[in-house]
Amino acid sequence: MPNPISLSHFAFAYGRPENTAVLKAEPADFQVDEHIAYTLSGEGEHLWVWVQKIGQNTDWVAKQIASWAGITAKEMGVAGKKDRQAITRQWMSLHLPGKQAPDIGSLDVPGVTLLKAMRHHRKLQTGGLSGNRFTLVLREINGNLDQIETRLQKIAGKGVPNYFGEQRFGNDFQNLAKATALFQGQIKSPKRHQKSLYISAARSWIFNEILSQRVRQGTWNRAISGDVFQLEGSQKWFADDSDPSLSKRVEEKGLHPTGALTGRGVLPSQSDAFQVEQAVLEKHPFWQAGLEKLGLKQERRALRVLPKEMHWEWLDQQTLSVGFDLPAGSYATMVMRELFEVKLED
Protein backbone atom coordinates (compact mmCIF):
# COMPACT_ATOMS: atom_id res chain seq x y z
CA MET A 1 0.00 0.00 0.00
CA PRO A 2 1.38 3.45 -0.89
CA ASN A 3 2.71 5.42 2.06
CA PRO A 4 2.06 8.21 2.74
CA ILE A 5 -1.31 7.97 1.02
CA SER A 6 -2.29 11.05 -0.97
CA LEU A 7 -3.38 12.04 -4.46
CA SER A 8 -1.04 15.01 -4.41
CA HIS A 9 1.90 13.13 -5.94
CA PHE A 10 -0.06 12.19 -9.07
CA ALA A 11 1.12 14.36 -11.96
CA PHE A 12 -0.77 17.43 -13.19
CA ALA A 13 -1.44 17.94 -16.90
CA TYR A 14 -0.96 21.72 -16.72
CA GLY A 15 1.43 21.92 -13.78
CA ARG A 16 0.56 21.99 -10.10
CA PRO A 17 -1.79 24.99 -9.63
CA GLU A 18 -0.69 27.82 -7.37
CA ASN A 19 -4.24 29.14 -7.04
CA THR A 20 -6.36 28.05 -4.07
CA ALA A 21 -10.12 27.81 -3.49
CA VAL A 22 -12.73 26.35 -1.15
CA LEU A 23 -15.32 23.89 -2.50
CA LYS A 24 -18.46 22.64 -0.72
CA ALA A 25 -18.62 25.56 1.70
CA GLU A 26 -22.34 24.73 1.62
CA PRO A 27 -24.34 22.00 -0.18
CA ALA A 28 -25.58 24.41 -2.88
CA ASP A 29 -21.96 24.90 -3.97
CA PHE A 30 -21.82 21.33 -5.31
CA GLN A 31 -24.84 20.34 -7.39
CA VAL A 32 -25.17 17.15 -9.41
CA ASP A 33 -27.85 16.18 -11.94
CA GLU A 34 -27.81 12.60 -13.16
CA HIS A 35 -28.28 11.74 -16.85
CA ILE A 36 -29.69 8.41 -18.02
CA ALA A 37 -29.23 7.13 -21.54
CA TYR A 38 -32.81 6.11 -22.32
CA THR A 39 -36.39 7.37 -22.25
CA LEU A 40 -38.87 6.12 -19.66
CA SER A 41 -41.86 4.32 -21.18
CA GLY A 42 -44.55 5.65 -18.83
CA GLU A 43 -45.82 2.16 -18.01
CA GLY A 44 -44.59 -0.98 -16.26
CA GLU A 45 -44.04 -2.52 -12.83
CA HIS A 46 -41.34 -0.08 -11.75
CA LEU A 47 -42.00 3.44 -10.50
CA TRP A 48 -39.04 5.71 -11.19
CA VAL A 49 -38.77 8.75 -8.94
CA TRP A 50 -36.59 11.82 -9.51
CA VAL A 51 -35.02 12.36 -6.10
CA GLN A 52 -33.45 15.55 -4.82
CA LYS A 53 -31.38 15.15 -1.68
CA ILE A 54 -29.50 17.76 0.32
CA GLY A 55 -26.75 16.76 2.74
CA GLN A 56 -27.81 13.11 2.85
CA ASN A 57 -26.21 9.75 2.08
CA THR A 58 -27.50 7.94 -1.03
CA ASP A 59 -27.86 4.51 0.60
CA TRP A 60 -29.71 5.98 3.59
CA VAL A 61 -32.07 7.90 1.32
CA ALA A 62 -32.83 4.77 -0.71
CA LYS A 63 -33.69 2.86 2.48
CA GLN A 64 -36.03 5.64 3.63
CA ILE A 65 -37.82 5.68 0.28
CA ALA A 66 -38.13 1.88 0.31
CA SER A 67 -39.66 1.98 3.79
CA TRP A 68 -42.08 4.73 2.72
CA ALA A 69 -43.17 2.67 -0.30
CA GLY A 70 -43.52 -0.54 1.72
CA ILE A 71 -40.87 -2.47 -0.20
CA THR A 72 -37.45 -3.92 0.59
CA ALA A 73 -34.15 -2.29 -0.26
CA LYS A 74 -33.54 -5.06 -2.82
CA GLU A 75 -36.63 -3.87 -4.71
CA MET A 76 -35.04 -0.43 -5.12
CA GLY A 77 -32.85 0.49 -8.06
CA VAL A 78 -30.11 3.13 -7.84
CA ALA A 79 -27.63 3.86 -10.65
CA GLY A 80 -24.89 5.37 -8.52
CA LYS A 81 -24.02 7.10 -5.30
CA LYS A 82 -23.94 10.87 -5.15
CA ASP A 83 -21.99 13.20 -2.89
CA ARG A 84 -23.44 13.76 0.56
CA GLN A 85 -22.29 17.35 1.10
CA ALA A 86 -24.17 18.52 -1.99
CA ILE A 87 -27.52 19.05 -3.66
CA THR A 88 -28.02 16.09 -5.96
CA ARG A 89 -30.82 14.95 -8.25
CA GLN A 90 -30.97 11.35 -9.43
CA TRP A 91 -33.37 8.60 -10.44
CA MET A 92 -34.32 5.72 -8.16
CA SER A 93 -36.71 2.91 -9.11
CA LEU A 94 -39.26 1.10 -6.93
CA HIS A 95 -40.66 -2.32 -7.87
CA LEU A 96 -44.43 -1.98 -7.40
CA PRO A 97 -46.08 -4.76 -9.46
CA GLY A 98 -49.86 -4.43 -9.35
CA LYS A 99 -49.63 -1.70 -6.74
CA GLN A 100 -50.85 1.86 -6.93
CA ALA A 101 -48.08 4.43 -6.92
CA PRO A 102 -47.87 6.31 -3.62
CA ASP A 103 -48.33 10.07 -3.54
CA ILE A 104 -44.79 11.41 -3.96
CA GLY A 105 -45.74 14.51 -1.99
CA SER A 106 -46.34 12.38 1.11
CA LEU A 107 -42.68 11.47 1.64
CA ASP A 108 -41.43 13.08 4.84
CA VAL A 109 -37.66 12.60 5.01
CA PRO A 110 -35.34 15.46 6.03
CA GLY A 111 -33.42 16.86 3.08
CA VAL A 112 -35.23 14.67 0.54
CA THR A 113 -37.84 15.66 -2.06
CA LEU A 114 -39.39 13.54 -4.79
CA LEU A 115 -39.67 15.94 -7.72
CA LYS A 116 -41.49 13.69 -10.22
CA ALA A 117 -42.36 10.06 -10.91
CA MET A 118 -42.86 7.91 -13.99
CA ARG A 119 -43.50 4.23 -14.68
CA HIS A 120 -41.06 2.04 -16.59
CA HIS A 121 -40.87 -1.66 -17.40
CA ARG A 122 -37.35 -2.18 -16.04
CA LYS A 123 -35.48 -1.68 -12.79
CA LEU A 124 -32.77 0.96 -12.68
CA GLN A 125 -29.49 -0.95 -12.66
CA THR A 126 -26.28 -0.04 -10.85
CA GLY A 127 -24.17 1.93 -13.32
CA GLY A 128 -27.21 2.63 -15.49
CA LEU A 129 -26.41 6.28 -16.07
CA SER A 130 -24.70 8.01 -18.97
CA GLY A 131 -23.17 10.83 -16.95
CA ASN A 132 -23.72 13.75 -14.62
CA ARG A 133 -24.05 17.52 -14.88
CA PHE A 134 -22.02 19.35 -12.25
CA THR A 135 -22.61 22.93 -11.13
CA LEU A 136 -19.93 24.07 -8.70
CA VAL A 137 -19.22 27.28 -6.81
CA LEU A 138 -15.64 27.85 -5.67
CA ARG A 139 -15.14 30.43 -2.94
CA GLU A 140 -12.30 32.28 -1.22
CA ILE A 141 -10.25 32.13 -4.40
CA ASN A 142 -6.68 33.27 -3.98
CA GLY A 143 -4.55 33.52 -7.09
CA ASN A 144 -3.92 35.10 -10.46
CA LEU A 145 -7.22 35.51 -12.31
CA ASP A 146 -5.54 35.52 -15.73
CA GLN A 147 -3.84 32.21 -14.92
CA ILE A 148 -7.16 30.76 -13.80
CA GLU A 149 -8.83 31.85 -17.05
CA THR A 150 -5.99 30.26 -19.06
CA ARG A 151 -6.40 26.98 -17.20
CA LEU A 152 -10.17 27.05 -17.68
CA GLN A 153 -9.65 27.42 -21.43
CA LYS A 154 -7.19 24.50 -21.46
CA ILE A 155 -9.51 22.26 -19.47
CA ALA A 156 -12.47 23.08 -21.73
CA GLY A 157 -10.45 22.58 -24.90
CA LYS A 158 -8.09 19.72 -24.08
CA GLY A 159 -9.67 17.85 -21.17
CA VAL A 160 -8.00 16.55 -18.02
CA PRO A 161 -6.42 13.29 -16.84
CA ASN A 162 -9.21 10.88 -15.93
CA TYR A 163 -8.02 10.10 -12.40
CA PHE A 164 -10.20 8.34 -9.86
CA GLY A 165 -11.05 10.81 -7.10
CA GLU A 166 -10.60 10.53 -3.36
CA GLN A 167 -14.18 9.28 -2.94
CA ARG A 168 -13.07 6.01 -4.57
CA PHE A 169 -10.68 5.26 -1.73
CA GLY A 170 -12.88 5.92 1.31
CA ASN A 171 -12.33 8.16 4.32
CA ASP A 172 -8.60 8.63 4.90
CA PHE A 173 -8.00 6.13 2.07
CA GLN A 174 -9.14 3.29 4.35
CA ASN A 175 -10.40 1.19 1.44
CA LEU A 176 -6.81 0.64 0.32
CA ALA A 177 -5.86 -0.84 3.70
CA LYS A 178 -9.06 -2.90 3.60
CA ALA A 179 -8.10 -4.21 0.15
CA THR A 180 -4.77 -5.41 1.51
CA ALA A 181 -6.49 -7.04 4.49
CA LEU A 182 -9.00 -8.70 2.15
CA PHE A 183 -6.25 -10.16 -0.04
CA GLN A 184 -4.46 -11.39 3.11
CA GLY A 185 -7.58 -13.24 4.20
CA GLN A 186 -7.99 -11.08 7.30
CA ILE A 187 -11.56 -10.05 6.40
CA LYS A 188 -13.80 -13.08 6.73
CA SER A 189 -17.05 -13.19 4.75
CA PRO A 190 -17.16 -9.50 3.78
CA LYS A 191 -20.44 -8.11 2.57
CA ARG A 192 -20.63 -8.11 -1.22
CA HIS A 193 -20.85 -4.32 -1.41
CA GLN A 194 -17.88 -3.81 0.92
CA LYS A 195 -15.79 -6.36 -0.95
CA SER A 196 -16.49 -4.54 -4.21
CA LEU A 197 -15.41 -1.21 -2.69
CA TYR A 198 -12.10 -2.63 -1.47
CA ILE A 199 -11.31 -4.35 -4.76
CA SER A 200 -12.18 -1.22 -6.74
CA ALA A 201 -9.95 0.92 -4.53
CA ALA A 202 -6.84 -1.18 -5.20
CA ARG A 203 -7.59 -1.40 -8.91
CA SER A 204 -8.24 2.33 -9.16
CA TRP A 205 -5.01 3.24 -7.37
CA ILE A 206 -3.00 1.16 -9.82
CA PHE A 207 -4.79 2.89 -12.71
CA ASN A 208 -4.02 6.31 -11.23
CA GLU A 209 -0.33 5.44 -11.02
CA ILE A 210 -0.33 4.33 -14.67
CA LEU A 211 -2.08 7.54 -15.70
CA SER A 212 0.28 9.68 -13.63
CA GLN A 213 3.24 8.14 -15.43
CA ARG A 214 1.65 8.90 -18.81
CA VAL A 215 1.03 12.49 -17.68
CA ARG A 216 4.71 12.82 -16.72
CA GLN A 217 5.64 11.52 -20.16
CA GLY A 218 3.23 13.94 -21.84
CA THR A 219 1.35 11.02 -23.43
CA TRP A 220 -1.92 10.97 -21.48
CA ASN A 221 -3.67 12.67 -24.41
CA ARG A 222 -1.79 11.19 -27.36
CA ALA A 223 -1.14 7.75 -28.75
CA ILE A 224 2.05 5.78 -28.16
CA SER A 225 3.06 2.42 -29.61
CA GLY A 226 1.07 -0.48 -28.24
CA ASP A 227 -1.82 1.62 -26.97
CA VAL A 228 -5.34 0.33 -26.40
CA PHE A 229 -8.01 2.84 -27.42
CA GLN A 230 -11.53 3.73 -26.32
CA LEU A 231 -14.12 5.49 -28.45
CA GLU A 232 -15.31 8.85 -27.11
CA GLY A 233 -18.73 8.40 -25.54
CA SER A 234 -18.39 4.62 -25.35
CA GLN A 235 -16.99 1.95 -23.04
CA LYS A 236 -15.78 -0.12 -26.00
CA TRP A 237 -12.03 -0.49 -26.42
CA PHE A 238 -9.72 -2.08 -28.95
CA ALA A 239 -6.02 -2.64 -29.59
CA ASP A 240 -4.65 -1.74 -33.02
CA ASP A 241 -1.05 -0.71 -33.55
CA SER A 242 -1.15 -0.87 -37.33
CA ASP A 243 -3.48 2.00 -38.27
CA PRO A 244 -1.60 5.32 -38.57
CA SER A 245 -4.88 7.27 -38.53
CA LEU A 246 -5.48 6.41 -34.86
CA SER A 247 -3.01 9.02 -33.61
CA LYS A 248 -4.89 11.70 -35.54
CA ARG A 249 -8.21 10.48 -34.14
CA VAL A 250 -6.78 10.82 -30.62
CA GLU A 251 -5.65 14.37 -31.43
CA GLU A 252 -9.15 15.11 -32.73
CA LYS A 253 -10.62 13.67 -29.48
CA GLY A 254 -12.63 10.92 -31.17
CA LEU A 255 -10.48 8.30 -29.47
CA HIS A 256 -8.71 8.15 -26.11
CA PRO A 257 -5.70 6.10 -25.05
CA THR A 258 -6.57 3.86 -22.11
CA GLY A 259 -4.94 2.48 -18.99
CA ALA A 260 -5.31 -0.87 -17.28
CA LEU A 261 -8.01 -1.79 -14.80
CA THR A 262 -5.98 -4.86 -14.09
CA GLY A 263 -7.09 -8.40 -13.42
CA ARG A 264 -6.51 -11.95 -14.59
CA GLY A 265 -4.70 -12.62 -17.84
CA VAL A 266 -2.31 -10.75 -20.09
CA LEU A 267 -2.42 -6.99 -20.48
CA PRO A 268 -3.85 -6.13 -23.92
CA SER A 269 -1.37 -3.28 -24.33
CA GLN A 270 1.94 -3.83 -26.10
CA SER A 271 5.29 -2.17 -26.69
CA ASP A 272 5.72 1.25 -24.99
CA ALA A 273 2.22 1.29 -23.48
CA PHE A 274 2.77 -2.18 -22.02
CA GLN A 275 6.10 -1.14 -20.50
CA VAL A 276 4.46 1.73 -18.60
CA GLU A 277 1.68 -0.48 -17.25
CA GLN A 278 3.88 -3.44 -16.40
CA ALA A 279 6.30 -1.23 -14.46
CA VAL A 280 3.44 -0.03 -12.25
CA LEU A 281 2.04 -3.54 -11.75
CA GLU A 282 5.46 -4.73 -10.62
CA LYS A 283 5.30 -2.17 -7.79
CA HIS A 284 2.09 -3.79 -6.50
CA PRO A 285 2.56 -7.56 -6.85
CA PHE A 286 0.42 -8.36 -3.82
CA TRP A 287 -2.56 -6.37 -5.07
CA GLN A 288 -2.13 -7.77 -8.56
CA ALA A 289 -2.06 -11.34 -7.24
CA GLY A 290 -5.16 -10.67 -5.16
CA LEU A 291 -7.08 -9.26 -8.12
CA GLU A 292 -6.08 -12.23 -10.27
CA LYS A 293 -7.09 -14.71 -7.56
CA LEU A 294 -10.54 -13.14 -7.37
CA GLY A 295 -10.90 -13.71 -11.11
CA LEU A 296 -11.35 -10.11 -12.22
CA LYS A 297 -10.97 -9.77 -15.96
CA GLN A 298 -8.77 -7.19 -17.65
CA GLU A 299 -10.67 -3.97 -18.31
CA ARG A 300 -9.72 -0.50 -19.53
CA ARG A 301 -10.42 3.14 -18.64
CA ALA A 302 -9.79 6.22 -20.78
CA LEU A 303 -6.73 8.22 -19.71
CA ARG A 304 -8.44 11.46 -20.76
CA VAL A 305 -11.85 12.89 -19.98
CA LEU A 306 -13.40 15.82 -21.83
CA PRO A 307 -15.76 18.03 -19.80
CA LYS A 308 -18.69 18.86 -22.10
CA GLU A 309 -20.85 21.99 -22.20
CA MET A 310 -18.37 23.72 -19.91
CA HIS A 311 -19.32 27.23 -18.80
CA TRP A 312 -18.03 29.49 -16.08
CA GLU A 313 -18.90 32.83 -14.54
CA TRP A 314 -17.15 35.03 -12.01
CA LEU A 315 -19.67 35.94 -9.32
CA ASP A 316 -17.08 38.27 -7.79
CA GLN A 317 -13.27 38.38 -7.71
CA GLN A 318 -13.10 35.55 -5.18
CA THR A 319 -16.06 33.43 -6.30
CA LEU A 320 -16.32 31.34 -9.47
CA SER A 321 -19.25 29.27 -10.75
CA VAL A 322 -18.33 26.40 -13.10
CA GLY A 323 -20.64 23.93 -14.86
CA PHE A 324 -19.84 20.91 -17.04
CA ASP A 325 -20.96 17.40 -18.00
CA LEU A 326 -18.86 14.32 -17.27
CA PRO A 327 -19.41 10.70 -18.30
CA ALA A 328 -20.30 8.17 -15.61
CA GLY A 329 -17.30 7.26 -13.48
CA SER A 330 -15.41 10.53 -13.90
CA TYR A 331 -14.88 12.94 -11.02
CA ALA A 332 -15.61 16.67 -10.88
CA THR A 333 -13.01 17.07 -8.12
CA MET A 334 -10.35 15.78 -10.52
CA VAL A 335 -11.35 18.45 -13.04
CA MET A 336 -11.02 21.13 -10.36
CA ARG A 337 -7.66 19.66 -9.34
CA GLU A 338 -6.13 21.07 -12.52
CA LEU A 339 -7.52 24.52 -11.71
CA PHE A 340 -6.99 25.02 -7.98
CA GLU A 341 -5.47 23.54 -4.91
CA VAL A 342 -8.92 22.84 -3.53
CA LYS A 343 -9.90 22.72 0.11
CA LEU A 344 -12.97 20.52 0.48
CA GLU A 345 -15.30 21.58 3.29
CA ASP A 346 -16.74 18.10 3.90
Curated annotation (Swiss-Prot):
CDD domains: PseudoU_synth_EcTruD (cd02575). It catalyses: uridine(13) in tRNA = pseudouridine(13) in tRNA. Gene3D superfamilies: TruD, catalytic domain, TruD, insertion domain. GO terms for biological process: tRNA pseudouridine synthesis. It is an enzyme of class 5 (isomerase). GO terms for molecular function: RNA binding; tRNA pseudouridine(13) synthase activity. The active site is at D83 (nucleophile). Keywords: Isomerase, tRNA processing. Coiled coil: none annotated. It comes from the Bacteria. The keyword Isomerase applies. GO terms for cellular component: cytosol. Belongs to the pseudouridine synthase TruD family. Responsible for synthesis of pseudouridine from uracil-13 in transfer RNAs. This is tRNA pseudouridine synthase D.
